[in-house]
Amino acid sequence: MVVDSDATSVRRKSLLVFALLFLVGCASAVEGPLVDRRGWVIHREFLPHSKASNKKVELLWTQPAGDGPWPAVLFIHGHQLVRDGGEAYVKTGALGLMARRGYVAAAVSQPGYGNSDGPADFCGPFTKDAVLTAIAFLRKQPSVSPNKTALYGYSRGAIVASMVATQDQELAAVILGGGAYDFFKWYPTPLAGIDANIKFESGLSDEAFKARSALYHAEKIQSPILLLHGTNDERVPLQQARAFAAKLQANHIPIRGRIRGRCMINLFTPE
């Protein structure tokens, strides 16, 4: 029989206490407000998904001091190696920054990211409906001007935001950065990893591609669009933004574009 020494016993007890504290910390991380690096309080909500009430949609949001109402902006992240979802915008201080500028600022976690229930469907209908769930919540807040709600989507988030805009005609503005708007022309993509994710999460059917390609639904968009893209974007060729812009212009949608020489300009957080 092996008998533990006092030192070994103490070490094991210390590790047990550490593990318990770690688990408690993980549990508390998904409940209650957060505080960003500049001390701004961020609220965390778990909303029932509009098409699957047993699944939750994570929304993080904050507002300026005072009563409002204020315009609102909802951020939609791209793919992440560390899948922290909307919390990325808390860590960078983006939500607090926008609140100081007079906006109700929010970030939604796409299904399969952060604390939002999956599965991830590569910018598909389940993700689109999760974003619509978040928008509906924001518009009901007394601090929000419901007719002044805007979206900012980056990469995958831009794909989702563009499809949301085909369904929600009341959006005040939509900012799309580095997105793909025609899956038929994009696939196969420049990166094998993206191809694998598309095949696994959405499948390769015409129906799946059309459900994620805003170019084929552009006539339904009513909101002003700002397109941001990079000439050397390694994920999505610039032609995707140009073709989408031409389609929007043909439908008389107010549009502005900004092209950067090397890569997509990302105002708040890296993918």
Which residues make up each language-model segment?
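Short beta-strand/loop motif that positions the catalytic acidic residue
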Residues: I221, L227-H229, D233
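N-terminal cap/lid segment of alpha/beta-hydrolase-fold proteins
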Residues: V30-D67
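C-terminal catalytic histidine-bearing segment of alpha/beta-hydrolase fold enzymes
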Residues: R242, Q249-E271
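Mobile cap/lid helix-loop segments that gate and shape the active-site cleft of serine hydrolases
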Residues: D84-G85, G179-H217, S223
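Alpha/beta-hydrolase active-site loop
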Residues: D121-P142
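Short substrate-entry loop that stabilizes the transition state in hydrolases
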Residues: G68-W70, G78-D117
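Short glycine-enriched nucleophile-adjacent loop
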Residues: A158-Q169
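Alpha/beta-hydrolase fold nucleophile elbow
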Residues: V144-S155
